[in-house]
Amino acid sequence: MSTMLLNRNTSMAPAVHRQNVQVLLEKIAEADAILVGAAAGMSASCGFNFFYQNDAIFEQYLGDFHRKYGFIGAFNGFYYRYPSPEAHWAFLARMGYMEYECPTGQPYYDLMTLLQGRNYHIMTTNQDFQFTRVVSEDKLSAIQGDSRYYQCSRRCHD
């Protein structure tokens, strides 16, 4: 299976990159345990750039917020000074909806193929639900939180 990924993902890559991938696959095969660290680049590799720019997904789900408030990318939307708490919660709710609706990116499936049958754990700063779709939560540490669990500061609702 790893050879299939190597051939599919590196057939057009320079020889040095193919060689580096081959070394990585060998190290994975030899490892007793694997700790994966993943951040924004993992989702960006799927083409999901909505946190930092107004890509097609951002425009589809949050374009009206951009037009109304002028911020670029969802990350700026988190810190925008909205005119009311309700407007801020409207953004957060729509952001959550977008993350639930966004399809799982192929690189997440590819990573799980590489890790299949191995002793591994994933640490991520990503909050976009991508990992929770492909890995059991006991093998995942979302060290900057998980936006599926938004809650107001008074914690009056689940």
What are these regions (language model features)?
Residues 1-158:
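Conserved catalytic core of sirtuin-type NAD+-dependent deacylases
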